[in-house]
Regions:
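Short glycine- and Lys/Arg-enriched binding-loop motifs that mark or flank ligand-binding interfaces
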Residues: 21, 26, 51
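Short aromatic-glycine-(Arg/Gly/Cys) micro-motifs in beta-strand/loop hairpins
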Residues: 8-23
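Structural detector for hydrophobic anchor residues on beta-strands
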Residues: 4, 16, 26-28
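A short, exposed loop/beta-hairpin motif centered on an aromatic-Gly-Thr core
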Residues: 24-35
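Short, charged low-complexity linear motifs
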Residues: 4-6, 33
Length: 97
C-alpha cells in the first residue's frame, strides 16, 4: 500500500483541515483530528478514482525528506501535524494502465 503525506491544519475554533502536498485539489476536513484524517482517506480514494476515470496519472508520493526540501511546503511541515494516508495499490495500478 502506498502512503501520501497529509498536512493536518488544526487552529483553535476552526474545523481541522487536511491537504496533500503531492495531490492538488485533494482536501478534507472534520471537527476533530481523527475525523479529518478519516475523511482524508476517503477524499484520497475518491480523488484517485476520479483521476483514473479521467485518464489522468496519479503523482507518486514524495518522501517526508523530499517535502522538507521543498521551500513551499517546509513551513507547513514545521507548523502543522503530518499524517500518512494510505492509497490502495490497486488504484495506482489502474492509473498506470
Amino acid at each position: 500500500m502506498t502512503h501520501y503525506v497529509a498536512i493536518v491544519e488544526e487552529e483553535p475554533g476552526k474545523a481541522v483541515g487536511v491537504w496533500f502536498p503531492d495531490l492538488p485539489g485533494c482536501i478534507s476536513a472534520g471537527d476533530t483530528v481523527d475525523e479529518a484524517i478519516d475523511h482524508a482517506a476517503q477524499a484520497l480514494k475518491l480523488w484517485a478514482e476520479a483521476m483514473v476515470e479521467g485518464g489522468q496519472s496519479i503523482p507518486p508520493p514524495r518522501t517526508l525528506t523530499e517535502l522538507k526540501a521543498d521551500p513551499e511546503i517546509a513551513p507547513d511541515l514545521a507548523r502543522y501535524m503530518v499524517a500518512l494516508v494510505p492509497l490502495p495499490d490497486s488504484l495506482l495500478r489502474h492509473a498506470a494502465e
